[in-house]
Amino acid sequence: MNVSFLNHSGLEEVGGDARATLGNRSHGLGTWLDCCPGGAPLTASDGVPAGLAPDERSLWVSRVAQIAVLCVLSLTVVFGVFFLGCNLLIKSESMINFLMQERRPSKDVGAAILGLY
């Protein structure tokens, strides 16, 4: 079924009348774009969308603030985990190197083995 926003052929295939449902089929892209005036400002001087009521404006501002805070917190967590992991990796490498140095045989053991021959 090939149905898109501007193609009404899918409704006719099902049995409905596309003209009765969605209007005249001769409407093109220009008709859809002419529904909104191009000269209207999209945002007010403070950056909030222009067509909002005062209650909606305060809700929008609070949502934007929540999104900003969550972004900062998530970045803090991501970088904290990254740097903690790097720090633990560096410490584990130094501990492995420390253990490798401790497992070398001492010079006394080598002298004792050579003394037996």
Swiss-Prot record:
Source organism, top-level taxon: Eukaryota
Modification type Phosphoserine: residues: S106
Transmembrane segments: 64-84
Protein's cellular compartments: Membrane
The keyword Transmembrane is annotated on this UniProt entry: yes
Keyword Transmembrane attributed: yes
GO cellular component: membrane
Lineage: Eukaryota, Metazoa, Chordata, Craniata, Vertebrata
Membrane topology: Single-pass membrane protein
Family: Belongs to the reprimo family.
Name by which UniProt lists this protein: Reprimo-like protein
